[in-house]
């Protein structure tokens, strides 16, 4: 029921991946 939290988690994962690549 927390779609915002879900999206935030996805963004966090994406950011972590980008940081890893960088």
UniProtKB/Swiss-Prot annotation:
An annotated GO cellular component: extracellular region
The keyword Phosphoprotein belongs to this UniProt entry's keyword annotation: no
Region spans: Disordered: 1-22
Cellular compartment(s): Secreted
Annotated GO MF terms: toxin activity
Modified how: Contains 8 disulfide bonds.
Keyword Nucleotide-binding: no
Tissue-level expression: Expressed by the venom gland.
Biased composition (Basic and acidic residues): 1-15
Main location: secreted
Keywords, in A-Z order: Disulfide bond, Secreted, Toxin
Family: Belongs to the CRISP family.
Listed name of the protein: Cysteine-rich venom protein collettin-a
Source species: Pseudechis colletti
């Amino acid at each position: 029921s927390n779609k915002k939290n879900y999206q935030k988690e996805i963004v966090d994962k994406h950011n972590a991946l980008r940081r890893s690549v960088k």
